[in-house]
Amino acid sequence: MIPYRQLVRMSHLAARFVGGADVHVVDPLVDLRNVFEQTDQLKIALECRNLTVDVEKVKNEYDEWFETYQKWKQADKESISQLKKELRAKKDGLLNALALPNLVHHAGKKQTPLLKPSKHAQYLAQQGLMRIDKQNHVVHLVGYPVVVQKMIREQLVDLFPGCQPISPSYFARAAILEALNIDQSTCIPFTDDSSHFPLTYLVGNSLPAITSPFLKTSFGEKNEWPISVQCTGASYTEKKNQVDLGNARQRMKHCALWMSKSAEELEGIINDANVRVGAYLDEGLDLEVKVREVRGSELKNYESQAFVVENRGLSLSRISRIGDYVSKRLNIQYSGSPATEKSEKSDGFVQMVYVETDIDRILARLVDDLIEGKEPPKYIRDAIKKSF
């Protein structure tokens, strides 16, 4: 069981109410009462993830903080300073509530398949096509693997023609990671060695990068829904024990994000992404893949549901239903039609679906097939020949 206190602390996300934290860049929704109104679902979400949390204690501490918060918002000049001190004294009530994971929409029951070991690293190294930098835990490719890598990257972009290409920052502040409830120990901290430099992480193409441009955004009626964006390039994580195309700290990825006004619309987006990615890997690249709905214990904190497209136990792509969990924390809203006699004003927080495909892992499995005597698709062979 994972102790609750090991969950991410939200001091940067809640900097406005904590004091002495990082530069304030996020203004999350702090009215979390609706989360505690769904106690049964919250307990299921925690049990699924193997998290031990005293929900009643967290709720009581949060209620005390929120009561003070409401007084602070309505306070006059004479009492506002004292109430601000009380808010900071009761900060754990807010921080522990913000650390709670997303509720579970649905979870799969299939066990994680047995991972078939990969032989691509030894093969490519012997061919002089890959060099492993063990000190920095990265790999360097030359020759035809680079050609195939670039081809897959371009084809994944073409796979989602409705997604607008963007080039997000490769860096994200701690508050962004906390808004996504991501374990910061899995990311690479970055500094310029000055004492005043804010806590920042090198993330590359990732969920923090692709959501950051929309921080504190309010979409209007003129936007075409769903709003969708995509990016490709290097993604970065902290060091792992194994260094190869599937586990290096720098890997090539394709990321796509959909934002919708309707939770019901997410189902169609998820199904379409599953079909597109699965068909591309299976039919386009001749990889034998299976789509699996992940179990609750495999869900990331920001996910309410997730599917993985796997080849012999190796996850090549992940489709994540997020809902409005992240948008409430990054303050990404939409404004709809004004209220009428028959309907209420349609404002709210956007609903999200995120798809991340690991290009380097796909390349690794293609090389594994080659080692086993399986020919790659003809168009890949033709592209390789042209590169020489």
Predicted segments — roles?
Residues I2-R131:
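N-terminal alpha-helical targeting/anchoring segments
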Residues N34, E64-E67, K110, L115-F388:
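TRNA-recognition modules of translation machinery and tRNA-sensing kinases, especially anticodon-binding
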